[in-house]
Amino acid sequence: MVNSNEEDERRILDVEESLLTQEEVNNHLTGLSSTAEDGSIDIYGNPPSKKKTGNWKACPFILGNECCERLAYYGIAKNLITYYTSELHESNVSAASDVMIWQGTCYITPLIGAVIADSYWGRYWTIASFSAIYFIGMALLTLSASLPVLKPAACAGVAAALCSPATTVQYAVFFTGLYLIALGTGGIKPCVSSFGADQFDDTDPRERVRKASFFNWFYFSINIGSFISSTLLVWVQENVGWGLGFLIPTVFMGVSIASFFIGTPLYRFQKPGGSPITRVCQVLVAAYRKLKLNLPEDISFLYETREKNSMIAGSRKIQHTDGYKFLDKAAVISEYESKSGAFSNPWKLCTVTQVEEVKTLIRMFPIWASGIVYSVLYSQISTLFVQQGRSMNRIIRSFEIPPASFGVFDTLIVLISIPIYDRFLVPFVRRFTGIPKGLTDLQRMGIGLFLSVLSIAAAAIVETVRLQLAQDFVAMSIFWQIPQYILMGIAEVFFFIGRVEFFYDESPDAMRSVCSALALLNTAVGSYLSSLILTLVAYFTALGGKDGWVPDDLNKGHLDYFFWLLVSLGLVNIPVYALICVKHTKKKAL
């Protein structure tokens, strides 16, 4: 007989939660708690009430913060290559390289923010502090684009090589603002998605399901900001002026900060667990010191605390896994330690959970590395896709379409695809796979990898046809670029969201900011690698006085060859990724 309280609870389970197994529902109903049990605290340092904090009631402020911050970021990034060529008078190759390096830096600095968040400040204060740095960088960049003394003289209708270059002082002001933004975003990127996911209690099956949906809507909010940047801001920058075009995203960055602080009373906070780098080093040192000791046949003899939670603040225990057994020696209790009870030195003896943290990082690395190729392909959206579009017919009656604004098709398809994926595709696929999320994170990422290759292949085909038409002095319509943007947009929905969720779910509790930063570092390495490949290809194909594959005048080059090179790289990567996925072992929290 089910009592009235249980009946009330069952009514609460909506369509979103129908993917829970009956066992999970029953366990939840019998062990219902009014406070979160994942180690989080509220603003007063107490266990947070499920009714008053977190969950979807806190998420609008986090999603609003992310939407406005991404609008600010993409308000700079989407058309930055045009600013380099038209305002700073750089060549196509130099401008593309500079943009890729800056974008790469924006995805490396999250390592700084992540370590600070997980070790010392926590995610909330890291986001707050780095947002201030971000805003200062935006303001400085706006001044650089607004004051005539801080930018080169206008040079319309002349090749970039013949224009006056920016002075050292002008570059100094511009790059200071640009790289302050890169530093500021380093404290936000690795923390905000994890901070949003922290609002859902991982020990509550209903909230765990909602957390999976949160990642979809988190990426949806990112693309709302991107959509506005790709349309309104790009048009303002190219038709009204760069000063106003940079001022608008600066204002939205201020709105982003305000949105974040307003939601403070509703947030759940995870305590920082200490330096993850130190814990990794402790495991390696302890394992080395006990290299000659034998592992016990019964793993229950490995050292672990008897408490419910681990010794690491804000972290649950992790179940022991096979593999990398040499690391298990860090948790072997020596004869001396057993007799003396000297268990307090983590440089000599580590818990199983601490050892499993290191194993988890090692297992993540192959997945991380195989995603670099996707980042190489994706980086073309803001660089060579834009330059390709600039060489096409962009006139509709009297209106000239800014080529960077075509990124709106990528954004639109993301905005359309996420609700379809979350509300229709997941329930449909779940019928066949039996997986609550429809697809595993790794399957989702694999589909994204394949679609990104198709996108670059579409760009290569368009470029081949465009070059043939250019020989007859016929300009191909820029609207032929739409398929490549659409394919890359669908690839984003699968790969990017899958990657964010994979690195959050698989990461140890006290390393979630760091692991989110590692996912972003993947994008950084991809941007740098893309820049390196482009520079090398441009150099070697231009030897002997040739124009090369990527000259300033693309009609004299072979950008299609470069795109096919990237397609080949992507096709080689897909089977490698599949093999890595087959061998991957998932983390299991206790």
From Swiss-Prot:
- One matching Pfam family is PTR2
Query: Residues where Phosphothreonine occurs?
Result: T126
Alphabetical keyword list: Membrane, Phosphoprotein, Transmembrane, Transmembrane helix, Transport
Recall the GO molecular function terms of this protein's record: transmembrane transporter activity
Question: Membrane topology per the record?
Answer: Multi-pass membrane protein
Subcellular compartments: Membrane
Tissues showing expression: Expressed in shoots, roots, stems, leaves, flowers and siliques.
Q: What is its main location?
A: membrane
Q: Which GO terms describe its biological process?
A: oligopeptide transport
Please tell me one Gene Ontology term that the record gives under cellular component.
Answer: plant-type vacuole membrane
**Which regions span the lipid bilayer?**
96-116, 130-150, 168-188, 214-234, 242-262, 365-385, 401-421, 445-465, 478-498, 524-544, 562-582
Presence of the UniProt keyword Membrane in the record: yes
- Which PANTHER family does the record associate with it? OLIGOPEPTIDE TRANSPORTER-RELATED
Q: Which family does it belong to?
A: Belongs to the major facilitator superfamily. Proton-dependent oligopeptide transporter (POT/PTR) (TC 2.A.17) family.
What this protein is called in its record is Protein NRT1/ PTR FAMILY 8.5
